[in-house]
Amino acid sequence: MKETIDFLIDTVEARQVLDSRGNPTVEAEVFLECGASGRAIVPSGASTGAHEAHELRDGGSKYMGKGVLNAVNKIHETISPALCGLSSLDQTAVDKLMIEIDGTPNKSNLGANSILAVSLATARASANALDIPLYRYLGDPLSNLLPVPLMNVINGGAHAPNSLDFQEFMLVPHGVNNFSESLRMGTEIFHSLKSLLDQKGLSTAVGDEGGFAPNLSSSVEAGDLLLEAIQKAGFKPGEQVSLALDAASTEFYRDGIYKYEGKSLNSSEMISYLSRLVSNYPIVSIEDGLAEDDWEGWSELNKELGNKVQLVGDDLFVTNTERLRKGIIEKSANSILIKVNQIGTLTETLEAIELAKMSGFTSVISHRSGETEDTTIADLSVATRSGQIKTGSLSRSERIAKYNRLLKIEEELGNQARFAGALGLGPKNI
């Protein structure tokens, strides 16, 4: 083991870079006394929950107001001097100090984008100094579970310029023994779907997350297309490949009513609609089936479908332990989506995952629609043995980067690698 002094933070650098949508984001680089360093770039979302931590943007005319030079300056002028001399191995202390300096409940002073970039870069610097992979540094010797991918192959909602209200229609290729075969299966279905769309004269343009964005009329039409694509690729729906949805219902919820596919539905009617979809399609997971503050509706939804499918809270929980605790008490869901930039530090992210585990909830590690080449979430999914990852479709290199990282991790683990899909899929054992 190296001397503790080797892990002292020397300085933190930061810069403005671009995400996959061409919007500015923050890259941070933490340098240690020993010469090791770690780098991280933060993502950003399009459909963001109202309760997420605050991204610091510049405003003004440059980059349509989305510049992050103010956040970069916060790192140089405030965060770097404060962290100098702290041990990078004490992630909790590093994150706690940044939270204390910020002094706001939603990190609106320093900005969650600046705090998170430094938080993630600190962990990577420690892993690099120890010469071990990030998943091993964040996890333990038993961190060998490769996640089932939830692949967003049809994009709608805020992620695509089409008429679909639901935001994501996902493939869940679980009926194989390893991650690499799961990835192959998803890729073949992706190409099968593209061929079908071509045949039907539908657009094969892709959305923010790399999935196709055809102008379909309904979720039912999207579901039918996916079943056809799965079978055309030679696989069995339900047995080998299941489906998952991200309704992103907050996006079409106004004044207690869900404005969905030309109809006005109350919570009970929306739940009935989701129940019909579950009955008619091999759906194993529904994310944000109801709006972020429709707590009564969520409890009703969980009572209706919680023993049949995974009910994932994204906007509902925003990777926040306080909101997750409320959901646990009120039995509002059975799973949490984990997005590191919703809460803004690695420590708080790990706390949310641990609370979910202790409460019998599953965790789905997730990207954002505005992504980068950073692959931290791939390592995080293996480190925490979450068993599931959402990182987009089978196109766009910022999505593929995470899949390729998981392939490398599986190769490194060799015969110790396990695949979550082979262990069974469902709300109790996904």
From Swiss-Prot:
Its main location: cytoplasm. InterPro entries: Enolase, Enolase-like_C_sf, Enolase-like_N, Enolase_C, Enolase_CS, Enolase_N. Its cofactor is Mg(2+). NCBIfam families: eno (TIGR01060). The lineage of its organism: Bacteria, Bacillati, Cyanobacteriota, Cyanophyceae, Synechococcales. It comes from the Bacteria. The keyword Secreted applies. Pathway: Carbohydrate degradation; glycolysis; pyruvate from D-glyceraldehyde 3-phosphate: step 4/5. GO terms for cellular component: cell surface; extracellular region; phosphopyruvate hydratase complex. Keywords: Cytoplasm, Glycolysis, Lyase, Magnesium, Metal-binding, Secreted. Catalyzes the reversible conversion of 2-phosphoglycerate (2-PG) into phosphoenolpyruvate (PEP). It is essential for the degradation of carbohydrates via glycolysis. It comes from Prochlorococcus marinus (strain AS9601). It catalyses: (2R)-2-phosphoglycerate = phosphoenolpyruvate + H2O. Mg(2+) binds at residues 246, 287, 314. It is an enzyme of class 4 (lyase). Binds a second Mg(2+) ion via substrate during catalysis. The active site is at 209 (proton donor), 339 (proton acceptor). This is Enolase. (2R)-2-phosphoglycerate binds at residues 167, 339, 368-369, 390. It is found in: Cytoplasm; Secreted; Cell surface. One of its GO terms (biological process) is glycolytic process. The gene is eno. Pfam families: Enolase_C, Enolase_N. Belongs to the enolase family. One of its GO terms (molecular function) is phosphopyruvate hydratase activity. Signal peptide: none annotated. Its EC number is 4.2.1.11.
